[in-house]
């Protein structure tokens, strides 16, 4: 094994080549691999653990942990070397010496020294156990898996049987209780990891969470897990091997990054859906723009959005409306849409780099001293310094904050009728806008989420304090940064859930808009032909030429500017149709002087007839949409983004929201948020991209 490692090292002595190779391929393919790994029923610890494997075991699902049996020999060699070296009088840190700044002290009582290590490191506070001072069980499970993965590599001087016991606890879903706070992740996560050691050694203060959520002591924990042997009496170095590592910080970081990768992909797809419902211009995804910028994250983000928008029924309709009247909206969309690939691309690059950094960390040997059996020596170093965790988590959290900022900007445009290209204010879906304020509360909530998320974007790693008698004078704060990033992920999921519900509301509003517009055009056409086509004698009337302009007026007018009262003289529809008739009357010349040929004389009859029938037609169109019998089916069914809409509306059973119903936005958002926490959105997300070949559309 050592020879093979040296051979690889000579080929790539600084590991830059391997690090670069790990980032090859698309981010989408990387996410697909993560999801596939997450769903495997067995995780075998073979020194190639991924963040997805850690996240799967952390979730406490049916994923089983198996140790690589071939590791038993090298683990035993390392353990035996420690025992032999102590018997031979070798002076080794943490075996015959004190710890940290007091390592000048000496003892020959190796077992007692390990017991004392665990005792003095049990310095955490748990409160009542229910008031938020206990590390979540999922994070503890992640830490257990990562620590075992490190110790299996055979450089730490610990018995294989201890690792088997930790794996047994994992498989039985029995989780030691660890304090939420109290580690600086250098020299490793000493305080929290000491509670795992405390459980396997049977310390009286050790507690665990049973599969049913109850708290049990160490003896009950072993019994529930089916562990027959008693508690371990630690041999020299074994306590230090268990606590002197970065597993708690890197374990939680693994969980965080699994979600961050999925959520960043979701943000790309939601930007595409945002373009669809906003009648945006897909030109912003053109590959040449992004090719000339060179950044791979941006190029992929644009290509994914391009794929979502290619052939989209909404984009076809938006193009048609744009050709009808190029001045209906600005020449370019606002930055939240038009520069979304440029904004998201760097965040994806940061998250990918952090993912690989953490995967290197969870597969590293990160305790001290390291036992090199081949050279017969203990090497004193500092791999316990969790700087890759602190830095990666700070960077990831800043990326998450940036994604949330973009999402909030897009949401703010979506609910604002000055910017959303014809959708109602606050996405109000009811008949009476004076009694329906739609997503107004949701926008306030989104502002709150975004503000907190931007605060969390501040770094943790610049708040280092010198610790442990100035021995640990620089330290990574890895777990603290991981915890803050986990908070940020939670907030981004709240924002994503809220945005997704709002986008589905907008999709349904576009469906209603199209059906109401068609109904209005049909009604106006019928009324125009009835009242404007002929005079009292049945002769063709000049007013008949108004029909085309009347229909063009309807096409240009925002449906929700008049839908609640289509014949109101205060609303633009009737005003603009009247203006059409007046303009034709002014152009009618001398014929206007005679009542039989006057266009203006037809105006009152036209409006009177329209008032009699148009409100009924609009209500009928609205009712048909609500009943599922609309003449024009919802365009979303023809789009690549449909799986996400189907997930929210069909699978989760959320509703189109109106002030007339009792259902609140928060109730619907909560359904999506809970499902997102359970990972149920992932399949729908990936289905949106199942046809993408991993490349931008060719330039032509």
UniProtKB/Swiss-Prot annotation:
Swiss-Prot/TrEMBL GO biological process terms: cinnamic acid biosynthetic process; L-phenylalanine catabolic process
The keyword ATP-binding is annotated on this UniProt entry: no
GO CC terms, sorted: cytoplasm
Post-translational modification: Contains an active site 4-methylidene-imidazol-5-one (MIO), which is formed autocatalytically by cyclization and dehydration of residues Ala-Ser-Gly.
Family, per entry: Belongs to the PAL/histidase family.
InterPro entries, A to Z: Aromatic_Lyase, Fumarase/histidase_N, L-Aspartase-like, Phe/His_NH3-lyase_AS, Phe_NH3-lyase, Phe_NH3-lyase_shielding_dom_sf
Subcellular location as annotated: Cytoplasm
Function: This is a key enzyme of plant metabolism catalyzing the first reaction in the biosynthesis from L-phenylalanine of a wide variety of natural products based on the phenylpropane skeleton.
Gene this chain is encoded by: PAL
First-level EC class: lyase
Crosslink (5-imidazolinone (Ala-Gly)) position: 186-188
Pfam families named in the record: Lyase_aromatic (PF00221)
Gene3D superfamilies: Fumarase/aspartase (Central domain), Fumarase/aspartase (N-terminal domain), Phenylalanine ammonia-lyase 1, domain 3
Annotated positions binding (E)-cinnamate: 244, 332, 338, 368, 440, 468, 471
Assembly and oligomerization: Homotetramer.
Residues recorded as bearing 2,3-didehydroalanine (Ser) in the entry: 187
Full protein name: Phenylalanine ammonia-lyase
Protein's organism: Triticum aestivum (Wheat)
Reaction(s) catalysed by this chain's protein: L-phenylalanine = (E)-cinnamate + NH4(+)
GO molecular function (one): ammonia-lyase activity
Coiled coil: none
């Amino acid at each position: 094994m050592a020879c093979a490692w040296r051979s690889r090292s000579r080929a790539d002595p600084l590991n830059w080549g391997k690090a670069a190779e790990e980032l090859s391929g698309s981010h989408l393919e990387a996410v697909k691999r993560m999801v596939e790994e997450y769903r495997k029923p067995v995780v075998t610890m073979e020194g190639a653990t991924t963040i997805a494997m850690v996240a799967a075991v952390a979730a406490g699902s049916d994923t089983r942990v198996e140790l690589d049996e071939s590791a038993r020999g090298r683990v035993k060699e390392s353990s035996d070397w420690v025992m032999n070296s102590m018997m031979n009088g070798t002076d080794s840190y943490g075996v015959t010496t004190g710890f940290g700044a007091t390592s000048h002290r000496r003892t020959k009582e190796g077992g007692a020294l390990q017991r004392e290590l665990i005792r003095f490191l049990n310095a955490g506070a748990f409160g009542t156990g229910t008031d938020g001072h206990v590390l979540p069980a999922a994070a503890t499970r992640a830490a257990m898996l990562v620590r075992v993965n490190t110790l299996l590599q055979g450089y730490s001087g610990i018995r294989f049987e201890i690792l088997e016991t930790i794996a047994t606890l994992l498989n039985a879903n029995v989780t030691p209780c660890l304090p939420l706070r109290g580690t600086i992740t250098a020299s490793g996560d000493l305080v929290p990891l000491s509670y795992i050691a405390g459980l396997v050694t049977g310390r009286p203060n050790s507690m665990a969470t049973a599969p049913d959520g109850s708290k049990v002591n160490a003896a009950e924990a072993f019994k529930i897990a089916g562990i027959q042997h008693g508690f371990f009496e630690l041999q020299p170095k074994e306590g230090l091997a268990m606590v002197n590592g970065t597993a708690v910080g890197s374990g939680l970081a693994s969980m965080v990054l699994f979600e961050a990768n999925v959520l960043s992909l979701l943000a790309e797809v939601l930007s595409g859906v945002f373009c669809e419902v906003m009648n945006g211009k897909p030109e912003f995804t053109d590959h040449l723009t992004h090719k000339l910028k060179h950044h791979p994250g941006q190029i992929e983000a644009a290509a994914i959005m391009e794929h979502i928008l290619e052939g989209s029924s909404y984009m076809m309709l938006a193009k048609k409306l744009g050709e009808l009247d190029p001045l209906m909206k600005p020449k370019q969309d606002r930055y939240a849409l038009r520069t979304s690939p440029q904004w998201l691309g760097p965040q994806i690059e940061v998250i990918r780099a952090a993912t690989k950094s953490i995967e290197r960390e969870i597969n590293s040997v990160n305790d001290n001293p390291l036992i090199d059996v081949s050279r017969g020596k203990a090497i004193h170093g500092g791999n316990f310094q969790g700087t890759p965790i602190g830095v990666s988590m700070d960077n990831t959290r800043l990326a998450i904050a940036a994604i949330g900022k973009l999402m909030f900007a897009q949401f703010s445009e979506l609910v604002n009728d000055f910017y959303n290209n014809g959708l109602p204010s606050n996405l109000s879906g009811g008949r009476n806008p004076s009694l329906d304020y739609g997503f107004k509360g949701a926008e306030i909530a989104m502002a709150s989420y975004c503000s907190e998320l931007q605060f969390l974007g501040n770094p943790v790693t610049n708040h280092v304090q010198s610790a442990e008698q100035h021995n640990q004078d620089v330290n990574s704060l890895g777990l603290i940064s991981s915890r803050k990033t986990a908070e940020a992920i939670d907030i981004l999921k709240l924002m994503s859930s809220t945005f997704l519900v709002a986008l589905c509301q907008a999709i349904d509003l576009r469906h209603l808009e199209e059906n109401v517009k068609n109904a209005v055009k049909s009604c106006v056409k019928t009324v125009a032909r009835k009242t404007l086509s002929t005079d009292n004698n049945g002769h063709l009337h000049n007013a008949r030429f108004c029909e085309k302009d009347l229909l063009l007026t309807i096409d240009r007018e925002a449906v929700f500017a008049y839908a609640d009262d289509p014949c109101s003289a205060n609303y633009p529809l009737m005003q603009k149709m009247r203006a059409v008739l007046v303009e034709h009357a002014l152009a009618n010349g001398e014929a206007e002087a005679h009542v039989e040929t006057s266009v203006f004389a037809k105006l009152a009859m036209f409006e009177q007839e329209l008032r009699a029938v148009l409100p009924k037609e609009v209500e009928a169109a609205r009712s048909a949409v609500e009943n599922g019998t609309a003449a024009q089916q919802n365009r979303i069914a023809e789009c690549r983004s449909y799986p996400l809409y189907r997930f929210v509306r069909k699978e989760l059973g959320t509703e189109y929201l109106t002030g007339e119903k009792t259902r609140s936005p928060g109730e619907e958002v909560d359904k999506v948020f809970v499902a997102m926490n359970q990972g149920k959105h992932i399949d729908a997300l990936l289905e949106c991209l199942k046809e993408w070949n991993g490349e931008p559309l060719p330039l032509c």
